[in-house]
């Protein structure tokens, strides 16, 4: 069935930028912009080789890209002697990937008991763990304390809570919420005043004084004011805010500020036309603020921490899927063996993820499709009105930038089973780093019930 409503300029632009498929109505490309390329890190031949061992759908990670990116980050902040990246485990909780990041000098940012368990199993402990939680259960706080992790308190009342359920360590971090609206230039980035996280400055002062009275010797400051910023200015701007706060807190309490944690928020260019963040420029911007604000106050020993998740892994992950069906009705639909249970972001946020049809990277993008999964929900769509090459049943499709908040946000709605995870190693070989769920996994929590014997017969 022929596609309708395709302008010549949309086809032409796709030809000029091989592999580009993002001519959605309203996109810069469809308005006459020349998009940048966004290429997969595997070829069709590589994908087919992996599929022989691991059926689609599966999440695939690029070890080479992950390591190179971690090294660029560490280089960008090498001017700060205490610098450390604490990878946000929530983004991609896989021990094989955590070990790669550990080998590149990273710690882990945990927010739950199970994330702490996973990190401990990977060999992280002490100052290699930052525990940032909210509405925190007692067992989680105790686990973090027992691991000697840096504990980041979200609320003033957590000072007493920490003392009651665990104890008071020598170093404690407190999370700051400035309230109001956070803007960059004329753009409103987020609304901290509506956020459930953190303490006001007045509460920070009170928390520091209480903690000092209980024996705390070193303090950290943490804040998260915006998510997925594609701007080299966010971290330097946040650093300026937190460095000035550090000076004020030091003067108000006499506390030794050991570190400032810039948390996450540095994003990735999900769309081909978006400019990528330059981490070297970002690091230099933070250094400028450091030298202008902290050094003159005699606070040049403050360490800089980051808690990047998306920036560390998103571009180095693909969701690899096979085309199962085509449907021709009022629109043209391509049905994949992956669904929102494998990648929630498009359905949950309306988020854009680039799509490449492997083996057709240089074909004209002259067909308009909705690319869907098989959930019984109409928002189970990876792309709407997306310009792509002609797609056939059996084609292998790569959904880009799924290395963070991809597998980790998966779920079992409709009885869907979570997919496997595979590592593309530096030498080009591949390794299974998480097997796919089975029906036995899905029904395991009924193993106590009278229904279990009949279920077990079907495995």
Spans of model-derived segments:
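Flexible loop/turn segments at secondary-structure boundaries
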Residues: 93-96, 118, 137, 160, ...
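Active-site loop/helix belt of alpha/beta enzymes
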Residues: 32, 178-324
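A charged N-terminal "starter" segment
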Residues: 2, 8-14, 18-151, 156-170, ...
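Charged (often Lys/Glu-rich) extended helix/loop segments that serve as interaction or gating elements
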Residues: 291, 299-459
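Short acidic, glycine/serine/threonine-rich loops at helix termini
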Residues: 98, 120-121, 141-143, 162-165, ...
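Conserved, mostly hydrophobic/aromatic
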Residues: 66, 90, 112, 144, ...
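General beta-strand structural signal in soluble alpha/beta enzymes
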Residues: 87, 108-111, 131, 152-155, ...
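Glycine-rich, aromatic-flanked loop segments that form ligand/cofactor-binding clefts
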Residues: 167-181
């Amino acid at each position: 069935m022929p596609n309708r409503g395709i302008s010549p300029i949309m086809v032409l632009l796709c030809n000029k930028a091989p592999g580009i498929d993002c001519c959605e109505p309203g996109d810069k490309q469809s308005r006459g912009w020349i998009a940048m390329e966004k290429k997969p890190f595997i070829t069709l031949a590589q994908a087919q080789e992996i599929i022989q061992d691991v059926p689609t759908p599966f999440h695939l990670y690029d070890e080479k890209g992950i390591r190179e990116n971690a090294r660029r980050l560490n280089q960008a902040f090498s001017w700060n002697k205490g610098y450390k990246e604490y990878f946000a485990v929530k983004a991609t909780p896989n021990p094989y990937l955590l070990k790669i990041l550990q080998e590149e000098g990273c710690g882990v940012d945990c927010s739950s008991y199970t994330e702490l368990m996973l990190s401990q199993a990977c060999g992280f402990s002490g100052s290699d763990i930052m525990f940032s939680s909210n509405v925190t259960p007692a067992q989680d706080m105790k686990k973090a304390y027992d691991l000697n992790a840096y504990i980041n308190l979200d609320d003033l009342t957590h000072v007493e809570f920490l003392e009651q359920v665990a104890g008071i360590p020598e170093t404690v971090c407190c999370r700051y919420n400035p309230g109001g609206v956070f803007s960059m230039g004329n753009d409103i980035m987020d609304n901290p005043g509506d956020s459930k996280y953190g303490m006001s400055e007045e509460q920070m002062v009170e928390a520091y004084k209480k903690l000092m009275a209980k024996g705390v010797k070193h303090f950290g400051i943490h804040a998260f004011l915006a998510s997925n910023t594609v701007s080299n200015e966010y971290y330097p701007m946040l650093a300026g805010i937190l460095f000035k706060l550090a000076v004020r807190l030091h003067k108000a309490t006499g506390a030794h500020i050991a570190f400032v944690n810039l948390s996450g928020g540095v994003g990735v260019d999900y769309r081909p036309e978006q400019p990528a963040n330059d981490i070297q420029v970002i690091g230099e911007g933070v250094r400028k603020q450091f030298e202008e604000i902290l050094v003159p106050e005699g606070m040049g020993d403050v360490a800089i921490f980051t808690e990047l998740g998306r920036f560390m892994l998103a571009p180095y992950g693909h969701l690899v899927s096979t085309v199962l069906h085509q449907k021709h009705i009022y629109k043209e639909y391509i049905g994949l063996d992956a669904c929102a249970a494998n990648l929630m972001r498009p359905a949950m946020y309306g988020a854009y993820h680039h799509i490449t049809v492997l083996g057709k990277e240089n074909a004209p993008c002259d067909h308009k499709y909705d690319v869907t999964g098989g959930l019984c929900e109409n928002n189970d769509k990876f792309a709407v009105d997306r310009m792509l090459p002609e797609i056939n049943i059996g084609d292998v499709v790569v959904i880009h930038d799924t290395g963070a908040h991809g597998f980790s946000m998966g779920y079992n709605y409709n009885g869907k089973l979570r997919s496997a995870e595979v590592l593309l190693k530096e030498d080009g070989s591949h390794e299974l780093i998480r097997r796919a769920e089975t029906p036995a996994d899905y029904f395991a929590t009924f193993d106590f019930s009278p229904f279990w014997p009949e279920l077990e017969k079907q495995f």
